[in-house]
């Protein structure tokens, strides 16, 4: 199911996702990237407002950005190969964060 998301450039790391009940929820963007192998853009995000010591669930979606860059459409990750790539990139990202 595609979900609408948008963000305000003043809050560059926040996206708002409308859930199945029509309620908007804020999510903080961990990072986004483009994959040439799958010809898609991806975003990894988690519920906003979580403390640094709290365990968080990181979510991943592919997305299509609108022409103005203010809104887009989240799409589910479709294949095991995509998940493998995302997990590898996330592991590298987290390892780099631990080194800092």
Curated annotation (Swiss-Prot):
Matches recorded under HAMAP family: UPF0473
Pfam families, A to Z: DUF1292
Family named by the database record: Belongs to the UPF0473 family.
Organism expressing this protein natively: Listeria monocytogenes serotype 4a (strain HCC23)
Domain of life of the source: Bacteria
InterPro entries (alphabetical): UPF0473 (IPR009711)
NCBIfam families xref list: PRK13678.1-4
PANTHER family found in the cross-reference section: UPF0473 PROTEIN CBO2561/CLC_2432, UPF0473 PROTEIN CBO2561_CLC_2432
Protein name: UPF0473 protein LMHCC_1068
